Amino acid sequence: MHGDTKKIRVDFTGAPETMLATLYGRALEADADRPILGDTYAKELVQRLDYDWAKTAITAKNAPSVTIRSAHFDGWARQFLAVHEEATVLHVGCGLDSRFLRLRPGPGVDWYDVDYPNVIALREQFYPPGASYRLMSASVTELDWLSAVPADRPVLVLGEGLTMYLTKESGLALLRRVVERFPSGELQFDVFNRLGIRTQILNTPVRRAGARMHWGVDGPDEILRDVPGLRLLVAMSVFDAEGFRDVPRRYRVMARVMSLVPALKNMAQFHRYAF
């Protein structure tokens, strides 16, 4: 990051504003005694931004609910990169995530962080592009941006906290286009089920940002049916993620209770597909 200490005012609304709640959760969790993610980049970035962080409703106590997801997708991405020394990574809806810096992929990996132009304009002040790291200003559902990405190697498409803000039609169109364009690769993303979409008013960061979630996915069969060429690798409830055992006890107790009802257990899911 740049050494300038002047704070930068941020003024996002809707879905882009929700990325600030995610960022703040990662920053707070970096100070935990036993952090799940340990994202010191997020901590530094929060100190550089002028924003009312109380609006996010994220606290040190509930921050692990954010970082368990980020840590899980870091792990899946590392697995992909470990067997694909030459690959393309499309980090769609990247927000202000420092994943490229956390993972530090090898020289054979071309990494693209993709998000709305106003998000990328802010992002490039802290994470400037380099030889193998590129920033792309685009709505991920306006698929012309994919034409600028070479399709000569395996691709990892990673969408954390993205799909639920897309419509079903635009989300499926994105997944289909990736499968059609690239020779092989993986899709890694999280989803909310339909109950999660119907009860989104209870999601404080989403409500306060004035964001709207649209696309609910009850299980991987829906994705496999609508995106030809995919093969399911893993689909799991967030409660079954490896890192969940490290969250505070009260969250583990809540998970045991919610897991008695399938629709509650599967409200938040992590999906991984190959093609």
Where are these predicted regions, by residue range?
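A short, conserved alpha-helix within the catalytic core of class I
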Residues: 135, 165-178, 182-183
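Rossmann-like AdoMet
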Residues: 1-90, 94-136, 151-152
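Short alpha-helix
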Residues: 210-240
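Short amphipathic alpha-helix with an adjacent loop that forms part of the alpha/beta core around
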Residues: 143-153
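Conserved beta-strand signature within the Rossmann-like core of class I S-adenosyl-L-methionine
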Residues: 156, 175-194
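Short, glycine-/aromatic-enriched active-site segment of Class I SAM-dependent methyltransferases
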Residues: 194-211
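Core SAM-dependent methyltransferase catalytic element
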Residues: 245-275
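A short SAM/SAH-binding and catalytic strip from SAM-dependent methyltransferases
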Residues: 154-170
